[in-house]
Curated annotation (Swiss-Prot):
Residues 180-197 have a biased composition (Low complexity). It comes from the Eukaryota. It comes from Homo sapiens (Human). The gene is FAM90A20. Residues 74-83, 97-114 have a biased composition (Basic and acidic residues). Primate-specific FAM90A gene family, thought to have arisen during multiple duplication and rearrangement events. Residues 16-42, 71-213, 228-247, 254-273, 309-389, 418-437 are annotated as: Disordered. Transmembrane segments: none annotated. This is Protein FAM90A20. Belongs to the FAM90 family.
């Protein structure tokens, strides 16, 4: 009988019995884990609580049914005062209440001292206290309410200025602003130094011998009027106009009489300090005060002639021997400029009839602007053909749009290019068939000249 029993079946029966017994012991609802099963050293990664791990069934993130609601420990009635009430006044105050009463009486005793100080600063006589205690209440009211000196309202107004003077001052201020804005830093420095002087010093230094009309109850001051010349903005000294003062209540006849008696005085050139700082001066016109000051054109005291700037291929006028008006000139550029191209042609020999007036030498003067359609002839290169023919001449014309057009012309022969002063002694009256010896130039130079002139003509035709 014992040999027939299978050990495996017996083991299976034992496991079933144990599981059934555990199921019977398990409670129906969720139960709280015992405190001995919690380990504070463990921390759950899902919920972040201590005492269990992420694998534990006690984690509320895994099993929401097993999550426990935290129970309240009890109500705290003293936390919130839902029924506030005021404590009643006790008939027999204790020691604490007595201390409070003493603290309140001390500031009342200090009231007379404060009152005396306030009377000293305010200057009011002290008030006598009344027997019924009204003085104490008034003193406390005086301390509580901030009182100060009443503002004094005056009816006096500012004197109104004469409309003529106000208009003139406005125009003078605007003129002064425009003059200061247009001045250079050196002019501003000199102007500030001149304006720092007193009005009496300026009057005596600028024009000390200017007669003034003797009019009763009227004061005139010199008024500096400066107008910049049209030639250059830096050619004249600028002075800040002085404001002229007039008295009120003058008749129109007195004003007209003062204007009739006003002398026209022309002042001397600018002071030496201003001339040294600026380099140029101006004539100033002085006049007595009126509605509009008399203005006169002012010319520069020192107008130095400007030296004409010469281009890289231009010739000074002192080296030219002369020629007829409007005669074409044959110029020869230096050998270093043979590789520049057609862009240098407008600067090589720009000469007008006004620049060559006669055969005799004359001092240099300012060159006028070149007209838009005035021709200027010159030789392009000192190159001649290989068979000893005439050299080339190029005629340059200035178009309306500011560009230049060139054309080839026959020209007389030139001297050797080794002598740069040969073109100075040549006369512009040489005929086309000159008897001067010709210079033989290789054909490559001639071909280069023709190529340059043709390219310039093509560019001009494309632009047109």
């Amino acid at each position: 009988m014992m040999a027939r029993r299978d050990p495996t079946s017996w083991a299976k029966r034992l496991v079933r019995a144990q599981t059934l017994q555990k199921q019977r012991r398990a409670p129906v609802g969720p139960r709280a884990p015992p405190p001995d099963e919690e380990d504070p050293r463990l921390k759950c990664k899902n919920c972040g609580a201590f005492g269990h791990t992420a694998r534990s069934t006690r984690c509320p993130m895994k099993c929401w049914k097993a999550a426990l609601v935290p129970a309240t420990l009890g109500k705290k009635e003293g936390k919130e005062n839902l029924k506030p009430w005021k404590p009643g006044v006790e008939a027999n105050p204790g020691p604490l209440n007595k201390d409070k009463g003493e603290k309140e009486e001390r500031p009342r005793q200090q009231d007379p001292q404060r009152k005396a100080l306030l009377h000293m600063f305010s200057g009011k006589p002290p008030e006598k206290p009344l027997p019924n205690g009204k003085g104490s209440t008034e003193s406390s009211d005086y301390l509580r309410v901030a009182r100060g000196p009443m503002p004094v309202h005056t009816t006096c107004k500012r004197p109104r200025m004469d409309p003529v003077l106000s208009g003139r001052s406005a125009t003078e201020m605007s003129g002064r602003g425009s003059v200061l804005a247009s001045l250079s830093p050196l002019r501003k420095a000199s102007l500030s130094s001149s304006s720092s002087l007193g009005p009496k010093e300026r009057q005596t230094g600028a024009a000390a011998d200017i007669p003034r009309p003797a009019v009763r109850h009227q004061v005139h001051e010199t008024l500096l009027v400066v107008e910049p010349t049209h030639s250059s903005p830096e050619g004249s000294c600028r002075e800040v106009p002085q404001a002229a003062s007039k008295t009120h209540g003058l008749l129109q006849a007195v004003r007209t009489q003062a204007q009739d008696k006003r002398p026209a005085v022309t002042s001397q050139p600018c002071p030496s300090a201003a001339t040294h700082s600026l380099g140029l001066g101006s004539n100033l016109s002085f006049g007595s005060g009126a509605k509009r000051p008399a203005q006169a054109p002012i010319q520069a005291c020192l107008n130095f002639p400007k030296k004409p700037r010469l281009g890289p291929f231009q010739i000074p006028e002192s080296t030219i021997q002369g020629g007829e008006l409007g005669a074409p000139e044959n110029l020869q550029p230096p050998p270093a400029a043979t590789e520049l191209g057609p862009s240098r042609s407008p600067q090589m020999g720009r000469r007008t009839p006004a620049q060559v007036p006669s055969v005799e030498r004359q001092p240099p003067h300012r060159r006028p602007c070149l007209p838009t359609a005035q021709a200027c002839t010159m030789s392009h290169h000192p190159a001649a053909s290989h068979d000893g023919a005439q050299p080339l001449r190029v005629l340059f014309r200035r178009l309306e749009n500011g560009r230049w057009s060139s054309s080839l012309l026959a020209a007389p022969s030139f001297h050797s290019p080794e002598k740069p002063g040969a073109f100075l002694a040549q006369s512009p009256h040489v005929s086309e068939k000159s008897e001067a010896p010709c210079v033989r130039v290789p054909p490559s130079v001639l071909y280069e000249d023709l190529q340059v002139s043709s390219s310039s003509e093509d560019s001009d035709s494309d632009l047109e």
